[in-house]
């Protein structure tokens, strides 16, 4: 699997009009300071990931104004990495995959008639639930921003929640559901995907166990521009 059909690759998330800024510092998980038009202002970071290779002092980021009354004046959407753009919004992949799956644009999942978001199962809520004559399917979508020497890696910080989701997907397979985890790499320079066993060995082990139990795993890289984010291609998974 190294390509997408034209329908899937043409579905996109349109970004708001963006302003170039300079990242100053990360205040906490969800707030960073940026310099824009000569002023230093707080900006919402839409991800709990560390993203140290993207959000560091002096790096170029792209932001949009927040509505009045919010705690932060801006929202960070993209960060520059060498000559490419990286989307840092951890919820964008969920929106993109819901849009793609709702249009039946990925052949692996085109046989389901019903597509829902945020459906509960056990002690978890999975991002997408598919239902139809083909059966029932849970999908968990993971946002990936870290790429090291061409290898996309997840997570970039220990993720107990991520391991829990994998365990629940495994349990769902045992109860007759189809289950899948889709890693969306929000940049286009990844050649393959691997779990980040050094940062989170528990997640890596849990992922291997999930695959052995029948959970499907896919990884897709994105084409990211100042205007849109869209799926670009499948990349191989290496455990």
UniProtKB/Swiss-Prot annotation:
Top-level taxonomic group: Bacteria
Disulfide bonds: none
InterPro entries per UniProt: SfsA, SfsA_C, SfsA_N
GO molecular-function terms, A-Z: DNA binding
Transmembrane segments annotated in the record for this chain: none
NCBIfam families: sfsA (TIGR00230)
Similarity comment: Belongs to the SfsA family.
Protein name, per record: Sugar fermentation stimulation protein homolog
């Amino acid at each position: 699997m190294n390509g997408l059909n034209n329908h899937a690759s043409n579905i996109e998330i349109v970004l708001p009009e963006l302003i170039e800024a300079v990242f100053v510092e990360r205040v906490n998980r969800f707030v960073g300071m940026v310099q824009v038009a000569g002023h230093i202002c707080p900006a919402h970071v839409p991800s709990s990931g560390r993203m140290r290779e993207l959000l560091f002092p002096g790096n170029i980021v792209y932001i949009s104004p927040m509505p009045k009354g919010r705690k932060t004046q801006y929202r960070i959407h993209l960060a520059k990495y060498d000559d490419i753009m990286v989307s840092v919004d951890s919820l964008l992949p969920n929106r993109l995959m819901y849009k793609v799956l709702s249009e039946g644009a990925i052949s692996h999942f085109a046989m389901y008639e019903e597509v829902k978001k945020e459906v509960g199962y056990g002690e978890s809520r999975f991002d997408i639930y598919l239902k139809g004559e083909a059966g029932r399917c849970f999908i968990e979508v993971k946002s990936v921003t870290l790429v090291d020497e061409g290898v996309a890696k997840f997570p970039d910080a220990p993720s107990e929640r991520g391991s829990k989701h994998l365990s629940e997907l495994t349990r769902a397979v045992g109860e007759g559901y189809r289950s899948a985890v889709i890693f969306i790499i929000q940049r286009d320079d990844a050649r393959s995907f691997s779990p980040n066993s050094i940062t989170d060995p528990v997640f890596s082990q849990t992922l291997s166990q999930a695959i052995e139990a029948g959970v499907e795993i896919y990884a897709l890289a994105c084409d990211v521009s100042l205007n849109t984010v869209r799926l670009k291609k499948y990349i191989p998974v290496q455990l």
